[in-house]
């Protein structure tokens, strides 16, 4: 019972939820601890704090009450020091041994529950955590009144008492090793305080530092998750009770606050000139953490878990000298801090130390690899060395015992001597804790690295576990990640119930659902919207893609309304299926009179999911009741059957649009690869020859909406394999079974749709290499196929069943009835022919619609064995077809109800075709109706009424743009979606004429509707649209048009040969290819021309730049010439040449020419006068600088 309580508490902590024990006692916004006014809380100085998590007083009381449940061997490492006072103090904890054993047993039980047997460390840690919470919750009710100063003083008092008493107890345990059990019992409480000395001092420091509220919240969350996951990840820990108990407010070592604290401690250590020791279990852990790191790690590594106190003492004494110099430095620092504390407010001094204590002591102690022996040995050695260095420590401890530590007191400005001593002593303890914290962090990092290999393996195991289990503990998911980075990652509590559902995730390996087209759902079960489809192995991709293709045999997705996607999963928009519908409807009209045909189905050519395959034509009787199916959730429903595969090695040439397609029925299991065993259809009329094969319920390919199902087939003379394409059979089975659920609910409505199958097959059926079937109806076909009768189990009178069976059996070898099959509840009905003779026409009425007679050109029809009822009977259920959408059963009631007429589109004259949201005759909204008009003007106005309107906008003469499918824009410039164009095309089709504005392009039309030029199609204004889906004239053509034999033959051949075999399409493809090639050539030429133009432009720019340079040079030369001219004129102004005027600008050229001639021909100027003249000229020109 106690273990259950502890586990409940454990789960509560993992969620980060804290529930007060007695909420009625709490005040609305105050700390629930009696005597606590909110001061000193970890999360802030808020008196309105409502939790005991950060309450220092509750922590103190909790630690006092926890000690009786701690096992004695955990305290042996402290038995190193001897103190006479400890002997007297060890007499007040009798009777705690039983509680220790009980605690240990509980810890073992919890460890076994978590699949970690044999770890006392984790057991004790978990037990202490839970005991800690229990005491904490109890203390919440006891600690509400009181004053801050008193609480702080009491706590500081007890902290110092713990220090002194624990030292005494250690000495006593060392000196009296034979009395260890007795000492433990006597000094249990004091020893607990000593064990938690670092915790209490850390809390006091936290009260001074007032760590930010967010840091405290993160600390609580991290510690809770650590405690939650400690049991599953502690493999090397040994007796770690105290460590688990102290993990409640630990912070993440990877946080910024912790890093800052570590940096500050390193600086503090380096300031004392201390060098790290390299003796760390033969590891050079050069973390440069400080002298505390080195010293403490020596003790941690040497002080292995030894339960012998004497061994601990020997290890301690052998290493004391290593720490002397460092402790001396710390002692000096201690005195300095004490003096500062006596003069300043402690809150201004200790925030960094507070951070360190909270962020280092807690995380290190929470580390699973540590043992309490090491912790105790570290602290014991350090404190003993401190006492050797400073005899005043005991004095300060006693002072703290008597007066209490007021370090957290807000009134620390007091400078009395007692307070100074207390502050100094607490500072000493704080520095000790800083040393211990750094040592713990060092060992934690080392042990983390040691456990990386183990964690890697565990991480792999957890991954495989995640694939099998939808839930797991949050800690199990986080721990392997933390080992990768050598430190703990911050983790916030998460409810395990919100974990992802692993059993229905995206089939792409490694995909978590992110980036899916349909949303960020990790449980997406389809490859269609997965952005990582390239990762999918080919076999998986093939399995999924095969289901996504168009179920029409021979269709590659080309010409579909919703683009050229091969993965189209619906018959809606398939041109082949639509053409087949048209052909079938034409034959129906030939067999029905015109007055009745006008009331036939208004959605025969509105292709929906599987409506082309399963609609049963009207040859001799009224067609069976059609059912409309919304396609909103088609893709999702079809995925249920995505793992069922089929083959179509053969396909009946009258299957499409003539009869329900029957998948093979396996006699044993249905494998995901498909139906391997052929369903055999025979024609022996003897019911005794029928054989039964069953569908085994399968999660991957259960074709029944209601669970397991069985199918019966009647076998006889000519057995054959009836296998066909995976997609076609899948869609057929889905469509046939979509009413299975409703069979139990409304048998009367379903009685008009007998779930029977008469399978006929032409052995000479032609299937080309692309799977395209020859569906032409002009071929002669022997009517020697079998007629298996499969009747529903659900309430049906034996007479009706007999009628259904005998109707088919009486056809004999020459004829057979084609009926839809029900795979949900099928059992062979064996009756005698005598019983069928007593059946009245009333019994046949619900089923007579389903019994049809096929009439094809050239075929010999055999009259029905039962009298025919009035053909083309007027009914609202005339041509509601069986839909392949799995959700058809959801709308069956409304579709079969007599009020189904109310579900049609309210637009007058609209039959549902051309609707944006689908070609549903039952569309009840004007939103997507192409014929809906907001202005009240009737769309069906005559051509003359609209001739006077603006013809420039919509190209259809007389159209004002209203009612366009693509928008109510009056300026619409396309005939696409124009209701007027659709109406005129329909009228023209009925009159055998075409419209002038589109008649030029009608020769190359690809829309299967005869006479349709592609205009007005829902999916766009493409004249070459190759689909009947959205064709505004398709429905009217089905209703009223009487196609000629040649036209019907053309349509049938086009549908049977497939789009790929259409010569027009091939020719268009060739033309497109040629155009693409020519376009590529033109683009290459353009690129060359652009390159040449660019080169020429660059050359032109270069020439222009050169010209500019030349012009600048010319300008400079002209300027220099002008200067020289002026200088020459000034120099020769006084020299008069013979026969010339004095030099000036006007005769300058002539003057220069004369001078040049004189100097060139000096021989002619040898007279003294000329020589003197030349000499004067030389002297005058000599001063000119050229």
Swiss-Prot record:
GO MF term list: cobalt ion binding; DNA-binding transcription activator activity, RNA polymerase II-specific; DNA-binding transcription factor activity, RNA polymerase II-specific; DNA-binding transcription repressor activity, RNA polymerase II-specific; metal ion sequestering activity; retinoic acid-responsive element binding; transcription coactivator activity; zinc ion binding
Residue stretches in coiled coil: 1056-1130
Bias kind Basic and acidic residues: ranges: 361-372, 449-487, 495-505, 666-683
Phosphoserine: residues bearing it: 250
UniProt GO BP: negative regulation of transcription by RNA polymerase II; nervous system development; neuron development; neuron differentiation; neuron fate commitment; neuron fate specification; regulation of transcription by RNA polymerase II
Biased composition (Low complexity): 685-709
Entries under InterPro entries matching the protein: Myelin_TF, Znf_C2H2C, Znf_C2H2C_sf
Residues involved in Zn(2+) 5 binding: 954, 959, 972, 978
Chain intervals with Acidic residues compositional bias: 86-169
Compartment(s): Nucleus; Chromosome
Binding residue positions for Zn(2+) 2: 506, 511, 524, 530
GO cellular component: chromatin; nucleus
Disease connection: Intellectual developmental disorder, autosomal dominant 39: A disorder characterized by significantly below average general intellectual functioning associated with impairments in adaptive behavior and manifested during the developmental period. MRD39 patients show delayed psychomotor development and autistic features.
Oligomer and partners: Interacts with SIN3B.
Protein name per UniProt: Myelin transcription factor 1-like protein
The organism of origin for this protein: Homo sapiens (Human)
